[in-house]
C-alpha cells in the first residue's frame, strides 16, 4: 500500500522564497560600414527583443508555484485534521458495533440453550397425555360393556317373566329354564359348515351367503327371528313345539360354480431333442497334409547341354 507523505513546512518555505532575477539585455554590436557589422548589430537587437516576454513568463511561473505551495500547505494540514477526526469517529462506531455483535451472539447462545429447557414441560405433558389415552379408552370401554350387559340381562328377564304361558306347569318351567340357560338363536350362528364328502365349490374371494328356507305356516322370516319392538329376541327353546321344529330345519345348500379360467388346462406331451450336427474329426489327431508336385515342361524348363545334343541327335 502506497502512503502519502506531506511536509507543510517546506511548502510554506517554498512559498516565501524571493522571486527569480529577470534576464538582462545582451550586448549589441555597435555596427560598422561593412555588411558583417550590420548583421551582428541586427542579431543583438533581435536577441534582446524578446527578453520582455521571457521575463514576464518567468515571473508568472514563479507566482503560480508560490500559490500552489501555499495551497498545498493549507490543504494538507486541514486534511490531516479531518482524517484524525474521522478515525476517532470510526473507532467509536466500531466499538459500538462490536458491543452490539457480542450482545447478539450471547443472546443467541442463551436462546439455543434455554429453548429446549423451556420445551421440556410441554413435551412431558404431551407424553403423559399420550400414555393416559389408552388407559382412559380401556376404562371407558370396560364401563360401557358392563352397563350394556346389565341392562340387556334385566330386559331379558323382564320379557321372559311377562309371558303368560311360561310360568304355569312343570313343562313350562322346563321350557323356560331351558330358554334362560343361555341358548343362542340360530340366526346368529351363520351358515352351517360344508360336509367333508363334497369339496366346496365357492371361490375363496366370493362372499358367503346363507340361504334359509321360509318357516312353515306362511310366517315371514322377519317375524320368526324378530321379537317385539324394543325387546330382545326370545330363544327358540322358550317358544315350545314351534321353537323345536324350527331348530331342526337345516338350510338348503347352495352350490356356486366358478367360471373356467381361459387356457388353464394342463399341457401334455413329450419334447423331442433334435439330432446333433455331424462333426469332422482328423485322423489320429493329426492334420492331413496335401502335396502338389509340378513337372517341368520338356522344352522350356530345366534344359541342359546334354539334353540339346540328344534332341539334335534324334
Curated annotation (Swiss-Prot):
It is found in: Cell membrane. Its main location: membrane. The chain crosses the membrane at residues 23-43, 98-118, 221-241. Residues 165-314 are annotated as: Disordered. It is a multi-pass membrane protein. Residues 165-184 have a biased composition (Gly residues). Residues 190-202 have a biased composition (Pro residues). It comes from the Bacteria. Residues 294-314 have a biased composition (Basic and acidic residues). This is Uncharacterized protein MT2145.
